[in-house]
Amino acid sequence: MGQQVIKSSTEKMEKAVAAYSRELATVRAGRASASILDKVQVDYYGAPTPVVQLANITVPEARLLVIQPYDKTSIGDIEKAILKADLGLNPSNDGSVIRIAFPALTEERRRELVKVVKKYAEDAKVAIRNVRRDGNDELKKLEKAGEMTEDDLRGYTEDIQKETDKYIAKVDEIAKNKEQEIMEV
């Protein structure tokens, strides 16, 4: 019974780290990346639609993103959505494709992005700690119900703590790498 609680908690922690990684992909570093547009929604015939479903997005150069809409009539809507998303990007529309040049990041902007990365990291750690708390609560209920001994409870809570420490270290490592990527000139 206790093993199931640990397994379930570990899976939830893994998902929290994966969600954090996806969230970081949308934080702009110095290089162009198609993932920065993942959260951009275009009002396409009245329905909010992700840009990735409306256009082919390529990265021909390190600091350039090219968006080729499948439907040329949607090019203006895509451009408006990118501007509205407030990503600090200036798309240029030549009628058939949208080009987004990524300017070099200023020192001030780099520091702002590092703060964002740290905030996301803290949110991920809180999520992991919440999973730990829930797992420990579940184990305590099992012990109260007489399904495990106090020694078993102590052992399982130590196991959950080890998993928590492992996943928090993963989040710290991912955050450190992203910060280095951002601060790279």
UniProtKB/Swiss-Prot annotation:
The principal location of this protein is: cytoplasm
Q: Which Pfam families match?
A: RRF
Question: In terms of domain of life, where is this protein from?
Answer: Bacteria
This molecule's function is given as: Responsible for the release of ribosomes from messenger RNA at the termination of protein biosynthesis. May increase the efficiency of translation by recycling ribosomes from one round of translation to another.
The root-end lineage is: Bacteria, Bacillati, Bacillota, Bacilli, Bacillales
Q: Name one GO biological process term.
A: translational termination
InterPro entries per the record? Answer: Ribosome_recyc_fac (IPR002661), Ribosome_recyc_fac_dom (IPR023584), RRF_sf (IPR036191)
Q: Which UniProt keywords apply?
A: Cytoplasm, Protein biosynthesis
The protein's matches in HAMAP family, at most eight in alphabetical order, are given as:
RRF
State the species of origin.
Answer: Bacillus cytotoxicus (strain DSM 22905 / CIP 110041 / 391-98 / NVH 391-98)
Name by which UniProt lists this protein: Ribosome-recycling factor
